Amino acid sequence: MNEDVLRSSHLPIKLAALHFLDLPLSVYYSLPQVSLSTGTKKLFAATAFGAVSLIIIARRFRRRKGRRKANSPVEQETFEFLTTIHLSKESDSQSVPQNSENPYTCNVVSGALYNKLSGSLPSLVSVRSRHSSSSSTCANGSNCWEEAGDAADVCNLLSLPVATPENLYLMGMELFEEALRRWEQALTFRSRQAEDEGSCVSVKLGAGDAIAEESMEDIISADFIQKLESLLQRAYRLQEEFEGSLGVTDPTTHPTNVLLADKHMDLSVREELEDTCLRDSISIASTDSFVSAAELSEHREMRSGHALGSLSPHPFYEDALQMAEEGKISCRVLRTEMLECLGDADFLAKLHCVRQACQVILCERATRAFLADTGKRILSAIIAKARKSPKRFEEVFEEMISFLEHTDHWENTENELSSRGVKHMNFYDVVLDFILMDSFEDLENPPLSIQTVVNNRWLSNSFKETAVASSCWSVLKQKRQHMKVQDGFIAHFYAVCEHISPVLAWGFLGPKCTLQDFCCFFKEQVLFFLKDIFDLDKVRYFSLETLAEDILHLLHRRSDLLMAYLATDVIHHLNGCSDTSVHLVHSALLEAQVQ
């Protein structure tokens, strides 16, 4: 085929077939023989148009269906919510044993107990639905406007609240109440489980082996129950403070009262059950039992006494807390945050207990002598570290102690302290709070003139020390002019401060040295001691005697720690070791021993 034939004007169909379809020559020569009518051509065109339209419509529906599936987390949450309700209803009709072989049914309680303690389950599901709906509707910005109507319908169906501070507060309270229910469930479940296991063992093995098994269970459960009840008491007090911001709760419906009432009711039931089980064990064991009836009765009394005691591990503190809530306890300065208390009522309740314990401690002459001697030795060591003679300080300190030993001066001393806000005469209010803590606070915020002198790099350390001492003496001189009693307790106290205040001020504000290390260590020990005596886990608030015993024990431990620090410092000084890092290491080791 030549090029002229292909370019002829009367062969358009053949040229199109050759150029676009690349047909073989056999098909090319058969094209002139094919002839299509007009109707066939119209039918072919309609069929092609319909096929293309169907393809486009199908692809359009497929895209819309994919977008609907992408926005279905709210529907999934709704389905999970309905499934959870269905499962909770099914759990009422059957109970699964705890030690089941099925791993998916382990640690499941009975349906009735689960139904009782899962009152806030819908609230938790609503919280999850709220978070999922907000994240799903705003995750894809291109789809938010297209499906605004569907999202509005879902929100109206689930009645989701608006995220306001009040709603978030209520949501947090619901979750907190859920945690309280779980802890109460653990408390009741653990105690009942121990009773049931003990009763079963007593029936199967006999009275002798039953007592051994039950005693071991009591040791384990007693520690756990005591810690859990302490946690619940703190949680209840925290819940009262939270609810106080919105309204006053009814004391009869308080969880503490309800829990105590339930436990008192359970005690009577447990005693009856235990008596029955013990009688059964005696009848079954017969002569093979090595436990007499008197021993069984004594064991039952010990168990009931421990159960009653575990209801209130800190009765002395609970009574003081009631007084604090009624506004019957006052103080000069609230140190709630510094001593890490749960609230002002908690601080005042513990303060009331500590005041009484301090009075018991100071009744012993040996304890007063120990405190006076320890204080004099520590303060004399601080003065000696400043390379000054502590002789005059020890003299005025002994004069102040002898002045306090005479009871004739106590009335005037009480009046002097009362005029300065100290309304209670005890070791905490006078020594720890009024003298030590106020001094530490004054040293943390010194006057601007002293700060300017100390921070001046062009002045020598000796000049700075002299300036700090002069400033302290001028302040004490001004205070002496306002004294009403010239030979009272405040006068003796100012005489002591004239020797120790400049040294302490330079120790805290001066350069890094052994004096500053010991001053900081002394302050830390005082703060640690205060935090310990205001901690329910460090001291026993069971009674006045136990609290006084623990406070005195902590006093000896902290004093021994300070004396050990001084002893190690003297040893290193004699050995020629002057590196301050050694002192810090030893202080850390000594602190680890106390903690």
Curated annotation (Swiss-Prot):
The organism's place on the tree of life at top rank: Eukaryota
The opening ranks of the lineage are: Eukaryota, Metazoa, Chordata, Craniata, Vertebrata
Pfam families under this entry? Miga
Where does it live in the cell? Mitochondrion outer membrane
Q: Which residues cross the membrane?
A: 11-31, 38-58
* InterPro entries linked to this entry: Miga
Q: Which GO terms describe its molecular function?
A: protein heterodimerization activity; protein homodimerization activity
The name under which this protein is listed is Mitoguardin 1
Residue ranges of coiled coil: none
Report which gene this protein is encoded by: miga1
